[in-house]
Amino acid sequence: FAPEVSLKNEKKWTHDANVIQVWSDFVEQMSADLIELQRLDNIRSGKSVLVDSRNNPSDIEENSMDFLFTSPPYPNEKDYTRTTRLESVLLDFFTHRKELYLLKKGLICSNTRAIHTDDDDGDHIMHLDEITSIAEEIENRRIEQGKTSGFEKLFHKVVLHFFGGMRIHLQEMKK
């Protein structure tokens, strides 16, 4: 389940591994842990929301958070959304391709496969020379090296959209 080719030493192969059961057992343990936590005293409330992190959810009051846990993507050519989308399908969160597309579109751009024609996150950091100069250097080097593939032409845009998306996200979460 990846674009890379890799091989394991055949002696270490697990034939007919029941990976779904192993994964399900871990999920069940996490659920049991959460149930156990509910029995503890002095537990603070928490809220988990599925939203585009660049758009502050309207149902969260300003200054109502003590902590924000986030796991931002890192710009590279590993499409981390594949795992998210696979998990969502396995858990029956989504049943239609459109839902998967909307999930992917709602994530901060971190690789060339996550850029959409209507993305404008990069516009939010065009005044920051530290970032735009890096994107410009990447694009200039691509041209110097004669790289012409579609994804290579998008590398510099990933930098702009990633940092623009992170800027929007952090500004929204600061509210």
Q: What are these model-derived regions, one by one?
A:
Residues 1-138:
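Nucleic-acid modification enzymes, centered on SAM-dependent nucleic-acid methyltransferases
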Residues 91, 163-175:
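A short glycine-rich, Lys/Arg-flanked "PGG" loop and its adjoining helix->strand segment in the class I
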Residues 141-155:
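Short glycine/proline-rich turn/loop motifs
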Residues 153-164:
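Acceptor-substrate binding/catalytic loop of class I
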